[in-house]
Amino acid sequence: MAKEEVIEMEGVVNEVLPQTRFRVTLDNGFEITAYASGKMRKHRIRILAGDKVTVEMSPYDLTKGRINFRHKDAHQAPRPTVARRYN
């Protein structure tokens, strides 16, 4: 699939499903099932219910999508960092 055929939309995560899938309500009101992109999994970016995300969808199946960006909230408290100890 060529990159030009991808439809990008914004939405809000409603529910976290098993196997790293999410139920997302798009800005136009449709509800889809989406999964986190490989880069998000690689960098361990957490997606929680209520997060605003950008979703890529194929024009051939508009019920499934890939989350490729999680928007930061201005009023959201920063997440605590964990000090790592190496032996």
Swiss-Prot record:
PANTHER family, per database record: TRANSLATION INITIATION FACTOR IF-1, CHLOROPLASTIC (PTHR33370:SF1)
Subunit organization: Component of the 30S ribosomal translation pre-initiation complex which assembles on the 30S ribosome in the order IF-2 and IF-3, IF-1 and N-formylmethionyl-tRNA(fMet); mRNA recruitment can occur at any time during PIC assembly.
Record-linked InterPro entries: NA-bd_OB-fold, RNA-binding_domain_S1_IF1, S1_domain, TIF_IF1
Location of the S1-like domain: 1-72
Species lineage: Bacteria, Pseudomonadati, Pseudomonadota, Betaproteobacteria, Nitrosomonadales
Protein name: Translation initiation factor IF-1 2
PROSITE patterns per the UniProt record, alphabetical: S1_IF1_TYPE
CDD domains the record matches: S1_IF1
Membership in a protein family: Belongs to the IF-1 family.
SMART domains: S1 (SM00316)
Purpose of the protein: One of the essential components for the initiation of protein synthesis. Stabilizes the binding of IF-2 and IF-3 on the 30S subunit to which N-formylmethionyl-tRNA(fMet) subsequently binds. Helps modulate mRNA selection, yielding the 30S pre-initiation complex (PIC). Upon addition of the 50S ribosomal subunit IF-1, IF-2 and IF-3 are released leaving the mature 70S translation initiation complex.
Cell compartments where the protein resides: Cytoplasm
Keyword Signal: no
Pfam entry (one): eIF-1a
RNA-binding keyword on record: yes
Lineage: superkingdom: Bacteria
Chief place where the protein resides: cytoplasm
Single GO MF annotation: translation initiation factor activity
Any one GO CC term of the record: cytosol
Sorted UniProt keywords: Cytoplasm, Initiation factor, Protein biosynthesis, RNA-binding, rRNA-binding
